[in-house]
């Protein structure tokens, strides 16, 4: 991707502001379904006219519905299952310390689909590329899609829930894994706070690093952002800091981070598509 310009930065700042308002008015249940749809729905609202027209031309369904397609084809295309994540290991500080697997991963799959969408290939291939891009940008903003292979991205790290917290979250299970917490339970809790009229305090670290977060512009950068979140003791993923019980205090502390990741996913997805379709339009000019 091209280096950021001041116009790019201002554009993304505007998108983040609008995206925040959009997210606060959205119902939120699970990143693997509802959150993917919301990320793409909000990204679509941020597209320019050229990009919106191209999305409508390529797709045979709404953009938000298109963004869950990649999960729905796992059973018929099992070779794509590894494309939804990138494995790391304890002690890793940057995705550059890992090796892309031969079977593919979220970063290499996204890069491939970006190339396809930006090409003059068949409409069907470009349609699927667009659906993959919408989904993978979301996956690469969920920290536990760039987590340890040894515990399947937090799927084998379990926490128990109190009956009170089960009721707040509308969760029947008495025991959940860390991946599920970040896939959807934190978002449910954020909606609970909003419905209760409580404000969600922004993390000071997020405020302090807002400009640097926005300037990180490649899928590898997004992965490094996730790794930084996972390496934060407050996330509770590092072995010395893991807890046996999911608490309301944890959800309250982590909700601003999870929601910020979703807003960034929408904003970056919109910027990416605006750039891709603008480049194609320019190339097609006589």
List PLM regions with ranges.
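N-terminal, motif-rich segments that launch catalysis or mediate targeting to/interaction with membranes
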Residues: 29-136, 143-286
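Bacterial N-terminal signal peptides that target proteins for export
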Residues: 2-16
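Cleavable N-terminal signal peptides
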Residues: 17-18, 28
């Amino acid at each position: 991707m091209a280096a950021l310009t001041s116009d790019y930065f201002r554009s993304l700042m505007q998108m983040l502001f609008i995206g925040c308002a959009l997210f606060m008015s959205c119902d939120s249940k699970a990143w693997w379904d509802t959150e993917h749809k919301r990320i793409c729905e909000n990204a679509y609202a941020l597209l320019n006219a050229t990009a919106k027209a191209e999305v409508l031309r390529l797709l045979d369904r709404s953009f938000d519905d298109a963004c869950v397609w990649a999960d729905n084809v796992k059973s018929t295309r099992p070779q794509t299952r590894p494309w939804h994540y990138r494995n790391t290991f304890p002690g890793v500080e940057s995705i550059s310390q890992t090796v892309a697997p031969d079977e593919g991963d979220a970063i290499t799959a996204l890069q491939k689909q970006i190339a396809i969408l930006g090409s003059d290939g068949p409409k069907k291939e470009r349609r699927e590329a667009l659906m993959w891009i919408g989904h993978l940008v979301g996956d690469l903003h969920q920290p536990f899609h760039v987590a340890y292979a040894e515990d399947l991205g937090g799927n084998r790290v379990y926490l128990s829930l109190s009956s009170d917290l089960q009721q707040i979250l509308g969760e029947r299970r008495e025991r959940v894994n860390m991946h599920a917490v970040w896939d959807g339970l934190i978002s449910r809790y954020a909606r609970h706070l909003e419905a209760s009229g409580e404000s969600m305090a922004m993390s000071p670290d997020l405020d302090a690093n807002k400009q640097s977060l926005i300037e990180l512009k490649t899928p590898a950068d997004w992965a490094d952002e996730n790794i930084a979140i996972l390496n934060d003791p407050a996330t509770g993923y590092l072995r010395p800091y893991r807890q046996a019980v999911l608490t309301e205090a944890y959800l309250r502390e982590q909700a601003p981070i999870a929601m910020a990741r979703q807003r960034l996913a929408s904003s970056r997805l919109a910027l990416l598509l605006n750039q891709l379709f603008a480049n194609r339009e320019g190339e097609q000019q006589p």
